Amino acid sequence: MFEDRTISVFTYNKETLLAEKVQTIINRGIANTRVRDFYDVYSIMNFYGEQIEKPVLYDAFSATCEKRKAIFTKDDIEATLHLVSADLHMAELWGQFQKSNFYVGDLEWKSVIDYVENTMKKYLL
């Protein structure tokens, strides 16, 4: 471990990570109990948004959907986002997530879901 050599570590690029999170958000809709996915999209885009390449993210999203056998139309995505943003249970889950994860701070559910929705519109629709 302390040798003088290089160790290669293979990781996903940011676009693939985002694509998988976004696909999960859309696929699960209001049945998604993992509001962490929303926080992850929010955080990644907040920190690395300028580095995200739209065509790479779009292709990664398409490949993720194909691999998971879940194809969505623009209308599907918009309808799901509307349902999620209006769902009171999702807001409650966010409150629980917020209380148990100090790093979330006072970040409100509405801010997160609006940000995620705008990100999807900008990059995928």
Predicted regions and their residues:
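Structured mid-to-C-terminal alpha-helical surface segments
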Residues: 1-125
